[in-house]
Amino acid sequence: MSATHKMRYNLQLVLPSNTRARWAWLLLLLSNPAAVLAKCASDYFVHSLPGQPEGSVLKMHAGHIEIDSEHKGNLFFWHYQNRHIANRQRTVIWLNGGPGCSSMDGALMEVGPYRLKDDHSLVYNEGSWDEFANLLFVDQPVGTGFSYVSTDSYVHELGPMADQFIIFLDRWFKLFPEYENDDIYLAGESYAGQYIPYIAKAIVKRNEKLPANQTAWNVEGLIIGNGWIAPNEQYRSYLTYAYKEGILKESSEGAQAAEAQLSQCSSKLSEVGKFGIHIDECERVMELILDTTKINGKCLNMYDIRLDDTSDSCGMNWPPDISSVTTYLRRPDVVKALNINEDKTTGWRECSPGVGRNLRATESVPSIQLLPGLLEGGIPVLLFSGDKDLICNHVGTEDLIQNMKWSRGTGFELSPGVRAPRHDWVFEGLPAGVYQQARNLTYVKFYNASHMVPFDFPRRSRDMLDRFLGVDITTIGGDPADSRIDGLKGTITSVGAHPNSTTAEEREKEKMKIAAWQAYYKSGEIALIVVAIAATIWGFFVWRSKRREQGGEYQGIYPNLESLSSSSLSTFRSKRRGRHDIESTSRSDEAELESLYNGPEISEVLETQDGRQRELSADGSNEKASASLMVERNLR
C-alpha cells in the first residue's frame, strides 16, 4: 500500500449473524488486510510528472499490482492512453529484456511519449508509439526495475514468468476494464524475444479454457526488436557478423581463439538439445571477440559497433541517456508521482543482477520453438533488427528465420524454391532499411541502427509500428510522412511531430471551444438564477417589513425569530449568491470541458496526496557492469 498516495477503499462487508462467527470472520480479515483494502483505478492516476513539458497533460496511470501475496511479489506498470484513435482501439504492451532489465528503458529512452533532456527535464518524443495505441510498460519478472519480491522468490524458468504475467494482466484489466477488448500487441526487444512468445502462448491457453462469462484477450501481433530468440543460430552468428563488419580478421590470433571457443559452444548446443537459452561456453565467444578490441582502456560497444566504451564495460554504460534516467527515477518527487509502494525500499536500477542470476531457464525451451505454432495459429509476428548491433545481430535473426519451419514452408518461402523478395524502404528520401514478408511473418532491417532501434530512429520505428498495426489515418485526416517501400507509399500513416497535425485534432480543438462556451454559458445562467432568487427573497422581506410597519401582518408567537437584522440578511445573501457557490457551479459545469481530456478521471485530478516519503537507497551504481562480463551480460 502506497504511503505517498491517498487511496480510496472498497469496503463491501457482509457480517455473519452469529456472534462467534462474526468474531472469527473479523479475525480472518485482520490477518489478511488485502481482503478488505482494494485499490481502484483512481489510486493509480498520475496527476503530473516533475519536469514535464508544457502542453496538454497525457493521461497516465502507474503503480504496483500484487501477483504473489505470499512472497510480496509486485509488478510495476506505467500506462499511457493513446493520443488519437485511428480505425480501432489498440494496446501495445512493451517489455525490455535482460533478463531483469527495466521497461523504463523503453518508456524514457525508446517508444514512450517522453525523453529526458537532462536529469530533471522531460521533452516530447516525436516518434512515440502512443500516437494511435495505448502503451503499457511493465517491469517484469518480479524484482525488475520498480517491481519487487522477497529475495529468495525470483523466477527461474520462463513458464512461471508467463504465468505471473497472466495474473498481472487479469488484475490490471479488472482495474481498467475499458481496455480489455482492445487489439493487444506484445512488443519488446532483446531477451524479451523469450518473454513475448511465452506470454503469447500463455494467453492463447487462457483463452482456450476461458469460462463463457469472461473476456478473451485479442492478441493481434507480436513485435520483437533485436530479439534473443534462437540461441543455436544466434550464438553461431557472433563470428560471422564480426568477420562481416571487420571487427575480427579471419586467421588472426584472436579469430583462432574465438573459433576454438565456438567449437566448444557448438558441442554444448548439441548436448543440451532442445534446451539451452543461456550457454556459458557460447557466451565466452562474445567475450573473446570483445577482448580483441580492447586498446588503451577502451573496447567495442557490443550494442552499437560504431561506438566504444571503457574496457571493463564494452557497452554496458550505453545508451548515454541512462545516467539521466537513473537520476530522474530515483528522485523522491518522481517516486511519489508514479505511486511507488513504500515496500519498494531500494532505488530504481536499470538491470537487476538478482533476476538475471536466477532466471537461467535451464528447463525452458528457446522461444524459437514456440513461434511456428503462434504463426500458424493466426498471430502475425514482426521481427526487426538494427544492423549495427553485435549482441543480437541481424545475421542471427535472418538465419533463424531461414531455418524456421511453419505453415508448410521453410523461412521466407512463397513456394518450393521461391523466396519472398526484399523490398527497399525509403523514409523521407533516405534509405531506411529493407522489408521482407511471408506467411504471417514480417522482417525489417534498419540501416545504421543499434541494439535499441527506437532510440536511434523513433519516427521510423513508429512508421514500422503503424504499418504493422494497420493504422489508417485517411478517415481522420493529416499529413503523413513520406515513407515508401519499393517506391510505393501504401497505407497512409502519420509519423509527424507532436502535436499531430490532423483534422481530428482540429475537430477536438473546436469541441473544446464549444464546450468552454457552453460551460461559461451554463455558469452565467445559474448565476442569474441565483441572483433572481436572492432578489425575490429580498423583495419578500422588504414587503413583510412594510406590512409590519402598517400593522397589517400577523405576528408569530416567537417574534424574535422574525427580527432579522440587516447584517444577518447580508450574510444570508452572501451565502445564497456569493462567489463561492458560483465558482462551485462553474467547476461542475466545466467538468464537461475537462472530460474531453480526462474522461472519467476528472474527479481524480482534485484528489490530494498525503503520507510520508520513504528515502530510496543511495546505492546508485550501475548494476550491469560486473567483473565477469560473460555472466552479467545483459540482453536489454
Swiss-Prot record:
Residues 575-636 are annotated as: Disordered. The keyword Hydrolase applies. Its main location: Golgi. Keywords: Apoptosis, Carboxypeptidase, Glycoprotein, Golgi apparatus, Hydrolase, Membrane, Protease, Signal, Transmembrane, Transmembrane helix. GO terms for molecular function: serine-type carboxypeptidase activity. GO terms for biological process: apoptotic process; proteolysis. It is an enzyme of class 3 (hydrolase). It is a single-pass type I membrane protein. Residues 1-38 form the signal peptide. Residues 544-636 are cytoplasmic. The keyword Transferase does not apply. The chain crosses the membrane at residues 523-543. It comes from the Eukaryota. GO terms for cellular component: membrane; trans-Golgi network. It is found in: Golgi apparatus, trans-Golgi network membrane. The active site is at S190, D389, H451. Residues 580-590 have a biased composition (Basic and acidic residues). Coiled coil: none annotated. PROSITE patterns: CARBOXYPEPT_SER_SER (PS00131). Protease with a carboxypeptidase B-like function involved in the C-terminal processing of the lysine and arginine residues from protein precursors. Promotes cell fusion and is involved in the programmed cell death. Belongs to the peptidase S10 family. This is Pheromone-processing carboxypeptidase KEX1. It comes from Arthroderma otae (strain ATCC MYA-4605 / CBS 113480). The lineage of its organism: Eukaryota, Fungi, Dikarya, Ascomycota, Pezizomycotina.
